[in-house]
Amino acid sequence: GHSDTEVLLHAFAEWGAGCVAMCNGIFAFAVWQVQAGTLFLARDRCGVKPLFSAHAEQNLIFGSEIQALLAHPAVPPPVEANGRDKVLFLGPGRTPGCGVFQNVRELLPGQYALYEADTGRLTLHTYWRLEDHDHPDDFAATVRRVRDLVTDAIERQLVSDVPVATFLSGGLDSSLI
């Protein structure tokens, strides 16, 4: 079988940074490009999977949790001047992009970054942004459209090379299914 990671690596080899626009799902990943000396970092459109980074001693330290960065001896733990307020809101309420600690930053939802090892430059790119559109449909058409979108999302999640199971909690999303 082909794991998601293997498919993602092949997609990156084929399309480069353009592969993230084709991804459907939640992800945060990095690809080291040996010949170019660059590190590619990407985060899913809604930011479900976090991705933090810090410049330290001419290197870029990155991980899915701030604790991973702080475990590195080159990443100091001092909190930013306004970070104390944010420590109380480490959930969805905190400021997007802020890593709370000095020199720790979070890649925003729908962004990818390219780190050049020889210059230490980190360039951020937005590949997706939620857009606002007029909604001219009536109630019945809206119900049909939402039903189609939910069915499509469920069918996409059922594609797997391993057995699939589900946990229905009784919340809004579970009740919808």
Predicted regions and their residues:
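Cysteine-centered catalytic environments shared across enzyme families
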Residues: 1-177
